[in-house]
């Protein structure tokens, strides 16, 4: 019997196996940010240990940064965490993309754009959305702070091998429907626990037609389905994306030869399989307090079926059978490690070009990195957004989570391109609706959700 992509990635990194069936995996890349690392570094100091492979460790600042004025950090805890990361990176000789550095940005955006993320690697970070890097056929997953310390000290991690789930995507996406809608459809259909104990492998003709940034969106939210990780076999688009980046392999042709072996064999069998015809999908919007509480834009909100839904309706201030078009939007956030890359901003800019944000709506565009921001500004996208009434910000995690000044006031609704809509995720009492960049941009113009398929726009972005 053939091997799955998961098998090939896993077996390549086994250092040892213990009597309990756990495998000691070698870690090729450890990404670090300011929130989950302080205790890990302190643990090293208390044990008189050092970082085993600082050359395989890379740090950035993203969660706590105020994106309106990156140097005006007024929160004591945020400032302490940022200062601590600087000190730790200096002491342990770790590369750091600090505030103001041209490489700074959200950890799961800068990894791929710097060429740190390449096929075949094991990648970990003290952040649940590390699964993003699986779009490059890397086995990437989030870890806890104690595990961060273990990787810093040993460059290894004890893990139990997950099962393999195959998700086949067939057909062509309709206009106005994007990778974000695919993953929201999967969550709405199969729930937030479908992937528990699995690694999701996305494959099929739809995947091959996707660009790398769309694939990253899919893998980013595999964790929302309970999966350990999301992975995609590499192809020519993968190789072209990586080629020429700062940390890409020097002997690139040799690397591509090895990477080309990373695929699921034709006679391999998945432990679970799902098949989806994406040509039948529509734009999605979440209405509740977990990512599976989502509907097509042309559907009504559901009837209450259990206590969780009853609580969600009460928290969100919505009613069963209500139309998604009637949800009032006061805030729009285009950003996060899910949808803050150049193609995401281009789509949003195409929607709002020559139009105006609805009175009373606060709309933010937060590029995922300094590089994304620079490229967007070279294309004039910042002018398009600012003339429409959006705020153009500096890179950071921003309104994805309530850890910095970018928050949603209690009781108000936000159309967000982020990945989580839990109670209080964007601030105490905030009401979050997860959507694609196109849906978020359109909501900013109307002050409520609309079917972006009916909007007039194209992908040709220029500013004049």
Curated annotation (Swiss-Prot):
Which Gene Ontology MF annotations are present?
3-isopropylmalate dehydratase activity; 4 iron, 4 sulfur cluster binding; metal ion binding
Keyword NADP among record annotations: no
Tell me which UniProt keywords the record has, alphabetically. Answer: 4Fe-4S, Amino-acid biosynthesis, Branched-chain amino acid biosynthesis, Iron, Iron-sulfur, Leucine biosynthesis, Lyase, Metal-binding
Record Gene3D superfamilies: Aconitase, domain 3
Name what cofactor the protein needs: [4Fe-4S] cluster
- SUPFAM superfamilies assigned to the protein according to its UniProt record, in alphabetical order: Aconitase iron-sulfur domain (SSF53732)
Keyword Metal-binding carried by entry? yes
Q: Reaction catalysed by this chain?
A: (2R,3S)-3-isopropylmalate = (2S)-2-isopropylmalate
Matching entries from NCBIfam families are given as: leuC, PRK05478.1, PRK12466.1
Q: What does this protein do?
A: Catalyzes the isomerization between 2-isopropylmalate and 3-isopropylmalate, via the formation of 2-isopropylmaleate.
Family that this chain belongs to:
Belongs to the aconitase/IPM isomerase family. LeuC type 1 subfamily.
Protein name per the record? 3-isopropylmalate dehydratase large subunit
Source organism of the structure: Bacillus cytotoxicus (strain DSM 22905 / CIP 110041 / 391-98 / NVH 391-98)
Name the gene: leuC
